[in-house]
Amino acid sequence: ELLDGASAEFDQELVSKGELSPVFFGSALTNFGVETFLQHFLTMTMPPLPRTADCGVIDPVKEDFSAFVFKIQANMNKNHRDRIAFMRICSGKFEAGMEVKHIQGGKAIRLSQPQQLMAQERKIIEEAYAGDIIGVFDPGIFSIGDTLTTAKDNFEFEGIPTFAPE
């Protein structure tokens, strides 16, 4: 009763537009509501959306690999002074060791030892697809917003939105 009176009716279309946020109640400690959350989460998630570039819209089902760098993090491994560039795959299939064009750098680079990170755990991956986030070693050549692709024609993804501090 309390939930019925305190909330709006669920509308998947509003969730998809980002105008409504679903709220779930549960406890991972007691395993209350976890299964319900996971089942609903799977039905509510959307496939990767097309991303706008200077040449038009890049569809996630396009065969050519493309990605953009959205974060660079240094010193993630205390034993090494590493830098990891996090990128979101926008189209195509990523394969470990593949050669891509770094558009802003103007040259081809090989992306070896790609990683997926979850909290403090790192896992070397062999492949990833549109919508996935991967981390690659950054020898100092990447900047936030950089585009990487295997496409024949060069293009750059539109900039990442920035927000002024409040």
Indicate residue ranges for each PLM-predicted region.
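Structural and coupling elements of P-loop NTPases
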Residues: 1-166
